[in-house]
Amino acid sequence: KNFGFANETTVVAPGINGKMDEVRSAYGLMALKHVDVAIESRKRVARRYREALKEVPGIHLFEDKEGVKANYSYFPIFIDERMYGMSRDTLYEKMKNAGVYGRRYFYPLISTFSTYRGLDSAGKDNLPEAYKMAERVICLPMHHALSEDDVERVIGQIIE
């Protein structure tokens, strides 16, 4: 709430100062005119990823929820190493070596940071699902300007 400060001089946790100046605010307001087009483009990318990856053993996808309007800014997949045949980290490196940059979101977990590591609440026994997901999730490249060829390259890295 106060940028990680407990008092005027004591920082107890990482924090962020998310204030924005007028120029960036004005730019953001101008960009809002194009947000619907960008979301629709990302939705097309998400549909193609979903269509191509839905039957791949060991790849688990989030489904769109009825009544929720997604902005498609991320496309996470979950890797079941046993079924897929390789770990998330192995796939990440394979993709990176081919010039395809996914992101290992939620990794490392904040609970493993030195600030939190010693807390009882941060232990693996207390957060089993968080630790499991942190080792399995990778977000595929997602941008409104991804070309069809780019999307097919990403898919190819996962399927081959």
At which residue positions do the language-model features occur?
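PLP-dependent aminotransferase class I/II
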Residues: 1-160
